[in-house]
From Swiss-Prot:
Keyword Membrane: yes
Cytoplasmic domain ranges by topology: 34-55, 115-131
Post-translational events: Ubiquitinated by RNF182, leading to its degradation via the ubiquitin-proteasome pathway.
One GO MF term attached to the UniProt entry: proton-transporting ATPase activity, rotational mechanism
Disease: Epilepsy, early-onset, 3, with or without developmental delay: An autosomal dominant neurologic disorder characterized by various types of seizures with onset in the first months or years of life. Many patients present with febrile seizures and later develop afebrile seizures. Some affected individuals have global developmental delay or regression, impaired intellectual development, poor or absent speech, and motor delay. Additional variable features include hypotonia, gait ataxia, behavioral abnormalities, and anomalies on brain imaging.
Name of protein: V-type proton ATPase 16 kDa proteolipid subunit c
Main subcellular localisation: membrane
Compartments it resides in: Cytoplasmic vesicle, Clathrin-coated vesicle membrane; Cytoplasmic vesicle, Secretory vesicle, Synaptic vesicle membrane
Length: 155
């Protein structure tokens, strides 16, 4: 096995896995959040069809999680080259896992809170502000992963 001047031939594999992890895990979280809160919207809209547009917020917030993963995956993919060092590729893997797994967790939280919040808001409209605050805290979990990933990938 030959080594280039910067690292072994297989070094780029870890960077590619970081880009893949960023996109796959954040998209899984976004898909779960969208599906879970979407079923709550569908159930709520039977009783209160006038609240459909107001209740779409959890679905939008879940979709933003996938954008975080896309941003990091594109940054990692753009930094790939033939002579990437093993150190740099492990940083890229860490960045991808950071944003991906935090996006997965945030997507799950947004889906569960969005589903329960939308159904509860249909019964008691005063719950809307509380639901939005909890959704913001869930979204911030994904944002923390994005910040760490940006720091790691630009090192």
């Amino acid at each position: 096995m030959s080594e280039s001047k910067s690292g072994p031939e297989y070094a780029s594999f870890f960077a590619v896995m970081g880009a893949s992890a960023a996109m796959v895990f954040s998209a899984l979280g976004a898909a779960y959040g969208t599906a879970k809160s979407g079923t709550g919207i569908a159930a709520m809209s039977v009783m209160r069809p006038e609240q459909i547009m107001k209740s779409i917020i959890p679905v939008v917030m879940a979709g933003i999680i996938a954008i975080y993963g896309l941003v990091v995956a594109v940054l990692i993919a753009n930094s790939l080259n033939d002579d990437i060092s093993l150190y740099k590729s492990f940083l890229q893997l860490g960045a991808g896992l950071s944003v991906g797994l935090s996006g997965l967790a945030a997507g799950f939280a947004i889906g569960i809170v969005g589903d329960a919040g939308v159904r509860g808001t249909a019964q008691q409209p005063r719950l809307f502000v509380g639901m939005i605050l909890i959704l913001i805290f869930a979204e911030v979990l994904g944002l923390y992963g994005l910040i760490v990933a940006l720091i790691l990938s630009t090192k």
